[in-house]
Amino acid sequence: GPVMTRALTHLDNCYFIKSLKAIGYVCKTNTVSNTAFRGFGGPQGMLTIENILYSVSQYLQKPIDEIRKINYYSKLNGLKTPYGQIVKNLRIDRILDEVYKLSDYKNRLRNINKFNLNQKANNLPFRKGIALMPAKFGISFNKPSLNQGGALVHVYSDGSIRLNHGGTEMGQGLFIKVAQVVAECFKVPLEQIHITSTNTAEVPNTSATAASSGSDLNGMAAWNASNVIKNRMIDHAAKLFKKNKKDIVLGEGRIICGNRSLSFSELAFSCWENRISLSSTGYYKTPKISWDQGKLRGHPYFYFTWGAAISEALLDINTGESRILRADIVQDCGNSLNENIDIGQIEGGFIQGLGWLTCEELCFSKEGKL
């Protein structure tokens, strides 16, 4: 299944592994049916290799960060994943440099070691720990047919713009991001974009909004639709100004040609008067991806996102109670469409992962009852 496939393709995490064979088994159980939420198998795969590296560090009696360092993807070690994809956008070195600097890791590690020695010497129950967790996450569905998106854009004669696309808004900020893409294409204020709820009567055959692909698929589809309309409007503006369309510039809600200009709404009205279509569908499919599910080989991800977190925890060894004292996170978001939304997603992802690993557990009886 797709969850197991993502787990298997994330067993390498950030590390070059020359020889790896992994087989996943999906089993039916007597418990209530459930599925993955965030990460969709990725975190489980990453934790597997991290536990392996931890075992190696314990056996060799070396810090785990040293074991990690000599195994990261690099031009020296190798850039080919166990499933055959070449890692091109390598960001791990820069991210590690930034997260170590941001977290003041070395000084804090020394202070934590002193704290633990003092607690142990005085027979006190508290212990502190600090740890790094790097991550490489593949962006795309590992079923190629799902990597497609559609959009419908209308420009009205008063200059207002209506947008519909195949993505689902569930509080993650997708609608705002796609609206920003349209606003950027037309060079108009965001307030001019009116978003309507996702509806297969308007945009059919939608893919799931998942796999961190919603902004990519629907944003590009909306851009393509908007670009068709924009080019029609520019062609008309060139006729109005009696200039080459290369001389037409869009900016801040206006269409400019030398020392002459029109507002976007004025041009939209003129297009309508001259019977120029101001509506278009848009479609996008992720390029350069392929996957053989039977062989678990191919190029399933368009690109990878990289990140790292350094967390400090306090533990009561008598009660088992723990608390996160501080977390520093560095995440590669490329050219972020909306930094505030992305920061919220990063923080939310960390908190959800914290809950998953520390306090969330479904307990079942032998009969399978919750």
Please place each PLM-identified region on the residue numbering:
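Gly/Pro-rich active-site capping loops and adjacent beta-alpha segments
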Residues: G1-G45, L117-L370
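Accessory "access/gating" subregions that flank catalytic or transport cores
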Residues: K69-H154
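Acidic-enriched catalytic cores of C-N bond-cleaving enzymes acting on peptides and small amides
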Residues: Q58, K62
